[in-house]
Amino acid sequence: MLDVNKFEYMKIGLASPEKIRSWSYGEVKKPETINYRTLKPEKDGLFCERIFGPTKDWECHCGKYKRVRYKGVVCDRCGVEVTRSKVRRERMGHIELAAPVSHIWYFKGIPSRMGLVLDMSPRALEEVIYFASYVVTDPGDTPLEKKQLLSEKEYRAYREKYGQSFQASMGAEAIKKLLQDIDLDKEVAALKEELKTAQGQRRARIIKRLEVLEAFRSSGNDPAWMVLDVLPVIPPELRPMVQLDGGRFATSDLNDLYRRVINRNNRLKRLLDLGAPNIIVQNEKRMLQEAVDALIDNGRRGRPVTGPGNRPLKSLSHMLKGKQGRFRQNLLGKRVDYSGRSVIVVGPNLKMYQCGLPKEMALELFKPFVMKELVERGLAHNIKSAKRKIERVHPEVWDVLEDVIKEHPVLLNRAPTLHRLGIQAFEPTLVEGRAIRLHPLVCTAYNADFDGDQMAVHVPLSAEAQAEARLLMLAAQNILNPKDGKPVVTPSQDMVLGNYYLTMEREGAIGEGMVFKDTDEALLAYHNGYVHLHSRIAIHAGSLKNETFTEEQNNKLLLTTVGKLIFNEILPNSFPYINEPTTENIEGRTPDKYFLDKGVNVREEIRKRELVPPFKKKVLGQIIAEVFKRFKITETSKMLDRMKDLGFQYSTKAGITIGVADIVVLPEKQEILDEAQAKVDTVLKQFRRGLITDEERYERVISIWSAAKDKIQDRLMKSLDKRNPIFMMSDSGARGNASNFTQLAGMRGLMANPAGRIIELPIKSSFREGLTVLEYFISTHGARKGLADTALKTADSGYLTRRLVDVAQDVIVREEDCGTDRGILARALTDGTEVVVKLEERLVGRYAHKTVRHPETGEVIVRKDEMITEDIANEIMKAGITEVWIRSVFACNTRHGVCKKCYGRNMATGMDVEVGEAVGIIAAQSIGEPGTQLTMRTFHTGGVAGDDITQGLPRVQELFEARNPKGQAVISEIDGTVISINKTRDNQYEVVVQGEVETRTYVAPYNARLKVEEGQRVERGQELTEGSVDPKQLLRVRDITSVQEYLLREVQKVYRMQGVEISDKHIEVMVRQMLRKVRVIDAGDTDVLPGTLLDVHQFTDVNAKALREGKRPATARQVLLGITKASLETDSFLSAASFQETTRVLTDAAIKGKRDELLGLKENVIIGKLVPAGTGMARYRKVKPAVKKETASDTVSSK
């Protein structure tokens, strides 16, 4: 068996007839499959045992030799070799074709490769191959030309005129003869000569032909091999035939297709032997050609061959294509053993790193481990009896199981796995029942809830796998979200509500103003009912033993509440005592204003002070982030568990519920509505008098009602009691928001109709009052649209993620430092005046490219190639610096990846990124995962510019696919001044820009809004009208940096509008992949062809070589490819073929004789190697774990 880890690369090419025969174990001569009586394979048929090997292990066809001892014997009676039946998966056969047949991929693909080699049009080829015309293969001394097509009539006429002095024939044989006559070197030289003078379409055609001919020349493939003399037959186990229960047979479509080929081939042989008339033979040859076409790619030409029920048969090409094809179904994703799935329920008492595994599931999953342990403990004599014990569920089995699963992590996965936190490792604890218990805090990462979600369990078997699960995938390790480095395990819902309730303050609560000597005394008073959780009390600060208190503070009284005392117990000792939800308190220390001198009238002080707001969800997130920053992982996960317990405990104690009585309708609502109605009437009057247009009237009415709703919302929120349960739920961030509440108690507001246009009659009722029938009907439109949108969005977002992963899958951190001399100048990303991403957010976790000094004092804030931490970023902001040179993925020189310095911090760990980290995939997941949260809608801005601005998911796709945007802006191609703006007859604007050298006139389309005025200076690439810039045009007019900046800013804009934060570096990784190719314009003296796409690094190599040899280097222009196109242009044909357009990619690769160097992740998954990222990188592979534990697979195989 071939060891996957031994080979370096994989090569694909065309197979010569000799090669096909050398693969084969014998010729398939009959179309029979298996004998209907004996159910054994027919001799020389499609399942023949003599060719493909025995159907039963170690047994020949006739039964003369049985058992292993005859291994390798070839039976003298039936000719079958005695061996394993597994060989029927690998042994091939062949069919000797009676006439050559063209391979449809090379003749029919676009562009037709055969057509390019022969310089014939695909139409002409088709006529020859399918016996409609003759082609002259050798004109002899006649005036005919080689490759000239002749109809039947012309052929006869020329035959009579010239006799045998010329040769013409039809079918694939003629094409084969022409292909054999081609002298590649001569042809290439002639074309290169012609290329020097050619222009226009002729030039493009020559370049295309040169590309194919060069490919044949350099790969050593013979063009004549595009025509088949021998057809390989794939192993029978790969096109099985199985008996169904009713005695009928189910068979793979390939067998039908092979049968047709064999039948027609045998008929053709017979006709040739009989010397049948030419016309009959030709017809049979054409049918054979069509049968082979159908076998290779059914439906590519003409109507597909159909099976029973008019279903097109699946040919060899279809076996590879699409989601159900070999690549995506079986190679990139396989079903695995040692796995199970079940419904999840909440496990509130679990630790962060634990999950509850149902007993029977655990027993099944860990069966081999349990069996081994039973034998070792002497509880069973051998594996067989151990197995029997487990099947009968002996009581002692459970004790053994308990011990086996200790310290053995399992992986839990919830589909859809949108990012790497969709699979995490936990230590299992056995639970009764049949449901998996999940820790409530990891739900956010999985996006799980307990309304019937299911999860899958996988058991890592080997010692290495267990070590990786424990060290890298344990849930307690994955606290930060890879997309923005913020904690992903923030408490939600009940937990938030409990902690909010716990930290509330209330005026005049029982026991207000009491002073306690320490926490225990305060808790005692609380448990005995002398003081309430919300009572503001004082406590001796020294008794808290908090390390952040100063000596002076320790001698004072701390003003706080009982609830806050309880809350602060969960925090580490050296953490500030949190008394108010402010950044200063969380990141710095407890503010002085809460410390009172001893002997002060505490009650008096309390009365003077405002109430401190309770801790909301955001604050809890801040606390977690700060604890993580100071104390790292173990401490954080312990604190999270304690926070969770507090939350559940106090939300239960609070007993917060909602009833209809909690929804208080606003008394002055009617006044507000009447006022708005009066305004609307005024607008209508103006419209009737013709003072305003219909469109303006519509706009105004809508803004009046929106303002009315906002006013109601405002009043509602102000008039609400702070202890109203609904208010508490929404204010704490547990569930619901202000707008939900307005709909319950205020008014529902404006609704959209099915077309997405807002209906100008608002819904004036709230849910509390009840809607009228019409109001109810109107509001159903929006509800339905919402559901339909969500369904569409999920599919779209998933496909976007797939394309992103594909284009960036080979971006891995490959080295420490690439030594680049470039960086990028980071400023705050702005859109007009609005800041999209603040400068400090862009700086944190990056390396400085140049030393940054304080502008006034000149002292060094951060040196070159030093990491910018949060503190340094704050210093930079305080110094008032607005732009900083940083190292960036954009400027990284590493091949096939990035280096540590250019990437900076790994967002998921908060540390430097490790060599081997698959940052490309992390980037793709970080951009794709929030995709579902982006809206689908294209907003109607209304008004004069009735132009749609694409936003949300479609805008992200438009940017990454580098499409021409909707509502494209006109941009200036030169630096200069706007000298005039004129309106033309058909309402278009003409903008004239005068530069130093030339003057350009730009016509802005009808109803575009201008962004410039006369006399204004404009730069190249500046927008003259509002709208989105076409990045390809920007690249042509300006430089690569402005395109990178533009794409980064635009993508960030879409996500930030939806409140999703993504680190810049993820978008940078993607944009870099889109810009990694150049198109050659002038080849100079190099071997590259003009118009070809090359990798930037390849191009530099080619030029470096040319310069060394004193030749003229090539010139090229940077191109921007959309992610789909970039994926298909990758160097790896395995990766491209498994993505899209499988047949085109493979055809192309085969002709070029491409080598796949197996650098990316996909290629290695496909061939079954360890991925070359993380611990699978060559540099780590030599490291062997010291533990020698027998793995489960050893145990199983020893049965």
Swiss-Prot record:
Zn(2+) 1 binds at C60, C62, C75, C78. One of its GO terms (cellular component) is DNA-directed RNA polymerase complex. GO terms for molecular function: DNA binding; DNA-directed RNA polymerase activity; magnesium ion binding; zinc ion binding. Disulfide bonds: none annotated. Its cofactor is Mg(2+); Zn(2+). Keywords: DNA-directed RNA polymerase, Magnesium, Metal-binding, Nucleotidyltransferase, Transcription, Transferase, Zinc. Zn(2+) 2 binds at C818, C892, C899, C902. It holds the Pfam family RNA_pol_Rpb1_2. It catalyses: RNA(n) + a ribonucleoside 5'-triphosphate = RNA(n+1) + diphosphate. Signal peptide: none annotated. Its EC number is 2.7.7.6. One of its GO terms (biological process) is DNA-templated transcription. The keyword Secreted does not apply. It is an enzyme of class 2 (transferase). Binds 1 Mg(2+) ion per subunit. Binds 2 Zn(2+) ions per subunit. Gene3D superfamilies: 1.10.132.30, 1.10.150.390, 1.10.1790.20, 1.10.40.90, 2.40.40.20, 2.40.50.100, RNA polymerase II, clamp domain, RNA polymerase Rpb1, domain 3. Belongs to the RNA polymerase beta' chain family. DNA-dependent RNA polymerase catalyzes the transcription of DNA into RNA using the four ribonucleoside triphosphates as substrates. This is DNA-directed RNA polymerase subunit beta'. It comes from Geobacillus kaustophilus (strain HTA426). The gene is rpoC.
